[in-house]
Swiss-Prot record:
Protein's organism: Lachesana tarabaevi (Spider)
Propeptide regions on this chain: 21-60
Domain notes: Both the N-terminus (61-94) and the C-terminus (99-129) of the mature peptide form alpha-helices which probably disrupt target cell membranes. The linker region (95-98) probably derives from a processing quadruplet motif (PQM), found in propeptides of many zodatoxins, hinting at a fusion of two originally separate membrane-active peptides.
Protein name per the record: M-zodatoxin-Lt8e
Protein task: Insecticidal, cytolytic and antimicrobial peptide. Forms voltage-dependent, ion-permeable channels in membranes. At high concentration causes cell membrane lysis.
PTM section of the record: Cleavage of the propeptide depends on the processing quadruplet motif (XXXR, with at least one of X being E).
Encoding gene per record: cit 1-5
Keywords (A to Z) from UniProt: Antibiotic, Antimicrobial, Cytolysis, Hemolysis, Secreted, Signal, Toxin
GO molecular function per UniProt: toxin activity
Subcellular location: Secreted
Amino acid sequence: MKYFVVALALVAAFVCIAESKPAESEHELAEVEEENELADLEDAVWLEHLADLSDLEEARGFFGNTWKKIKGKSDKIMLKKAVKIMVKKEGISKEEAQAKVDAMSKKQIRLYLLKYYGKKALQKASEKL
């Protein structure tokens, strides 16, 4: 679970970096204005913004695919954890637990895991007190 949180934080950081826009200096804007013979500074900013859009689209595509891969792997890990917990908690065979988990929706599996780990965390906290 810790690795999932770290991976999620890394993906969020990369998305923020990809969507951040570098600061534009007056010198860069003047060059764009001279190249395109623009009289208005706002037009130069607009053209520079259009030039940056293609890079942002490529970055979004990369991070979107990465996010889908991470989400798929986390779903598989949740399924395996739910099966292990059912086997341990209910004392049933692995096949029976797998059948129960397969019948559950992703939302039900998440709730089951949150409930289990919530109780476990509460027990640890009460032991420390």
